[in-house]
């Protein structure tokens, strides 16, 4: 499809057609973070996320004002960046955040972007789809140095072909995911998306996760529990009912539930309040 770039830029609050430079990449990542929430309502309601075409992603995240998970966020952003003149490679990763060292090897079910900026050396890791701990700035795809984002410091380490992204959270380095720099075709990403949106053991199928990152805070909703992380302090809010959770989804996170009107969203949310 011919990307409706203007529609996307309006969705994230930017005007005009920006130049494909590093400043634009930073601005788009920041605007996307604060404008399009992370959410898994489709898998939770039994709706597979199978189509990662530009048409499908634009229709859901822009036209219908929904959110999505990594394959959708980074899928849409990849198409946008290519339309602007950036060179984009899609990569796959394994989520290791909060996993025990001796846990089984996780599947490659995370999607990130490797982006080249015209006229600049090297490549940048871009990820607007890792929920409440997602990168809030592009960082150099370079192992070793600590790299400051709009929020926490991050760093990449490398072991053979594997890169590991870690974030400094409350003073400690937390590994988030590993990935290789081998580009992945869309069909491979659609297989991963199908798996995490339909497998009965997937946490996207069994629990509710919603997140958004503003300029000064990270908002993370898991079931009935909302955590707001801001300037080293965390506020915890516990909702009493599924109705209150849905109100937060609509009014705090800005998700339009109109395209789910034929489904009993409140009943399904009530089933997973404490998961």
From Swiss-Prot:
Q: Which residues form a coiled coil?
A: none
Q: Where is the active site?
A: 70, 110, 127
Task: Report the catalytic activity.
Answer: an arylamine + acetyl-CoA = an N-acetylarylamine + CoA
Q: Does the keyword Transferase apply?
A: yes
Q: What keywords were assigned to this record?
A: Acyltransferase, Transferase
Q: EC no.?
A: 2.3.1.5
Record keyword Transcription present: no
Outcome of mutating residue 110 to A/R/W: Loss of activity
Q: Name one Pfam family in it.
A: Acetyltransf_2
The family note in this entry says:
Belongs to the arylamine N-acetyltransferase family.
PANTHER family registered for this protein in UniProt: ARYLAMINE N-ACETYLTRANSFERASE 4-RELATED (PTHR11786:SF0), N-HYDROXYARYLAMINE O-ACETYLTRANSFERASE (PTHR11786)
Quaternary organization: Homodimer and homotetramer.
What the protein does comes down to: Catalyzes the transfer of the acetyl group from acetyl coenzyme A to the free amino group of arylamines and hydrazines. Substrates include isoniazid, anisidine, and 4-aminoveratrole, and to a much lesser extent, p-aminobenzoic acid.
Protein name per the record = Arylamine N-acetyltransferase
């Amino acid at each position: 499809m011919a990307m409706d770039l203007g529609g996307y830029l309006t969705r994230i609050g930017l005007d005009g057609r920006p130049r494909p430079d590093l400043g634009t990449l930073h601005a788009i990542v920041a605007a996307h973070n604060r404008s399009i929430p992370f959410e898994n309502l489709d898998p939770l309601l039994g709706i597979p996320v199978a189509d990662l075409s530009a048409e499908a992603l634009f229709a859901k995240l822009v036209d219908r004002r929904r959110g999505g998970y990594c394959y959708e966020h980074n899928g849409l952003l990849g198409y946008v960046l290519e339309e602007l003149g950036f060179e984009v490679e899609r990569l796959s990763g394994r989520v290791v955040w909060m996993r025990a060292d001796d846990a089984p090897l996780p599947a490659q079910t995370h999607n990130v972007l490797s982006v080249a900026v015209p006229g600049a050396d090297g490549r940048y890791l871009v990820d607007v789809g890792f929920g409440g701990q997602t990168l809030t700035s592009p960082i150099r795809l370079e192992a070793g140095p600590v790299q400051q984002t709009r929020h926490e410091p991050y760093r990449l380490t490398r072991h053979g072909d594997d890169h590991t992204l870690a974030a400094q959270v409350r003073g400690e380095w937390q590994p988030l995911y590993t990935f290789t720099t081998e580009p992945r075709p869309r069909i491979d990403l659609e297989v991963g998306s199908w798996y995490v949106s339909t497998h009965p053991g997937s946490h996207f199928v069994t629990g509710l996760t919603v997140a958004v990152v503003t300029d000064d805070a990270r908002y993370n909703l898991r079931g009935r529990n909302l955590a707001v992380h801001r300037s080293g302090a965390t506020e915890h809010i516990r909702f009493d009912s599924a109705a209150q959770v849905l109100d937060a989804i609509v009014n705090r996170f800005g998700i339009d539930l109109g395209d789910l009107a034929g489904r009993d969203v409140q009943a399904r949310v009530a089933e997973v309040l404490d998961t």
